[in-house]
Amino acid sequence: MRKTVFLHFVPKYLLSFALSLLAVYSSAENISSRLTVDMTTDKACYIPGQSVVFVLSGNVPANTMVRYRHGSAILETHKLSEVMSNNKWSWTPPMADYQGYLVEVYTETTNQSTILGTIAVDVSSDWKRFPRYGFVADFDNAGGSIDKNANIKSEMAYLNRLHINGVQFQDWQWMHHKPVKLDAHGSLIPWYQDISNRWVGVEYVKNYIAEQHKYGMKSIFYNLCFGAWKNAVNDGVKTDWALLKKDGSGNFYQDYHGLPSSWASNIYLQVPGNMDWQQYMAERNTEIYSHFDFDGFQIDQLGYRGDVYDARHKVVDLPASYKSFIQAMKSAHPDKDLIMNAVSGYGADNIVSSDVDFCYNEVWGNGNGYGGVSEADFANLLGIIQANDKYSDHQRQTVFAAYINYDKADNGGSGDKMVNTPGVLLTDAVIAALGGSHLEMGDHMLTREYFPAAPLAMSDALKTAMVRYYDFQTAYQNFLRGTTSKAAYLPVVSTSSNYSVNAWPPKSYSITTFAKKVGNCDVLHFLNFLNTDDLSWRDVWGTRTFPDKYTGIPITVTANRKIDKVWAASPDSHAGAVQELAFTQKGDDVSFVLPSLEFWTMVVMEGSNDEDHVYITGEAVQLDGHAAYDLAYAVPMTNKGEGKVFKVTTYLKANELFKFTNGRDWRYCKSYCAEYKDYQFNSFVSLAHITTLGEDFKFMVPEAGYYDITIDLEKMRVYLTKADLSGLSAIIADKSPSGEFASWYSVSGVPVDKPRKGIYVRNGRKVLF
């Protein structure tokens, strides 16, 4: 027989109602587009309080309007003629930081808006919150035959139109171990040759930086963390810093990255964790920052190198060395940004958990000889984002260096020598829908790991499409990247059409869906794989074809809550403008018509708080005689009007598993799981992230007892500590004063039929059961 412990307590009894959702109907907004207007902004991103200056080109009717949106919400609307003078006007966004906006120029009749043009605005005080990374890699004027400074202005104007907020300078330096070339007096030498014998003009490096800073972009220089040219000993590099390998006979030699014989040198590797090497490179970086106005350092590596050793023939842990190198660079220049490449994921856990500003993954089809596993499929990209989120404690964004049309580019730009537009757009659609970003844009589109190479050209149509796609990922950045992968889930979606619909990962000849919970919104992505069985993002030979564009697809989504509004937007339609959709809701089913699908359409369902209940289930709370995951006996958590925060004090068995759900029916409810298998709370670990996507990993505690458990579904976190029961005194009470068995309630006043170990209220007193 269990003893019950009471403490006098007068609860505020709450009456709860279980209301089934009635049918809800909503009408649609009619929208069309006639994209005759182009716009630019004076910066790629803005800090809160800055005004945005727009310049418009193209003819507009007299009744043209302009409106500013955050998501579907319209913040302001004006007659364009009242705010614009000489094709220019300004707008000051709200003061909120890290927000994306879409500006729509349109005309309107009684029943329809016609979009003439759109442009995005990013208000972010720090670019690392929503990085959109570009590159530059050419600093020559071809012997004076081209106007390089004019090219710099036009190239950066285009990157500004794409809202690129950070630019990587590839192959800008002189020698890897001595990037800045100085004369005997310590002054910059105006011209030098890089490792491939290309000429680099210091003037042009500086002018790129100045032009980028004008637009609010960050300028990041590139270098290896462990590279030196031949004869580097003449510049102070010590032989005992060398990274060594061992041949088949057991002889040690310095590891190196071989390059063509026509180039200036191979690259000879040093131990990145060697403190003397770190000091040497920190001094070189001081020279860089003293002569160039760079904002940070893009650190590179070469992936898995096999077994490697230091000068004393001790094994070197390269990933640990990378982390040490990053920390040394940050200590030397704490105000500068740092990014490091995780080549095929090598060393990612050490890199991402160190002091980098965001995650940067160079992905390959087969590890590219670097020892990595294949990352060629679209499905791999989500796994990389999830891993980065875990390694960074969900603090850092992911940028992919993913080279499109690689084999076509590597074979001299075979065929038409053009980048394949549908290959680019589907890859960019998937990366953005998953919450990532794609390093691809510079003075050309990146198709190879050697950034100066430009074997494939962009068509004008692709350049325009890039504007649409970068506008889209900037305007809707809060819906795409405002939460991490722990807020992702696999939506339950069906269609009455003949088209196949499946939840992530992509499936041949199907519409693939992916979703995230963002605030009070379910953000659903529809990705078009209906016309293809090619599930690789690489499109290596540039053979992907344009998909058919589908319209009027009937969709039904299981929502589990009351939906107030449904809207759609696509970079492929109406320049990304919002289109409100008619919908019906019957019970848990929300039905609407997807207006169009070419590569990618995003649908957002706005509604009330969907988490009215949260329960704990599993072996750790299992009742005798009942299955561990019988939701009828799950432990209910209570919400005291604290938004999406639920709490309970309950008994947990030692070393047994548990997780959380938002319902009592496995057919419809959502599970909130751990990110790691058998995640253990203890006296040192009281916080964990939860996720609704991926493996069904669960939590445990090492010691049986009563625990205070809090789950926050806004932050997607769970907090767990041992309960303090010192204030409770033991009083046995089985019946109420009237002699009848008293009813049980949770602490917040919810009736409980079957009390279990935990704190409840009975007969006006708090009970430890």
Listing of model-derived features with the role each one plays in the protein:
Residues L116-M175:
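An acidic-aromatic substrate-binding cleft motif
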Residues N498-R561, T601:
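Carbohydrate-binding surface patches
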Residues M156, N160-E203, G227-A242, K246, ...:
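Aromatic-lined carbohydrate-binding/catalytic grooves of carbohydrate-active enzymes
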Residues N609-A654, G663-A688:
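Aromatic-rich carbohydrate-binding modules that target alpha-glucans
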Residues G273-F358, W364-G383, S392-D393:
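Active-site neighborhood of glycoside hydrolase catalytic domains
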Residues K586-N609, Y707-R717:
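C-terminal beta-strand-rich structural cap/linker in extracellular carbohydrate-active enzymes
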Residues P131, A137-K148, F221, C225-F292:
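Active-site-adjacent "subsite" loops/lids of carbohydrate-active enzymes
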Residues R396-T484, L530:
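Aromatic/acidic polysaccharide-binding cleft in carbohydrate-active enzymes
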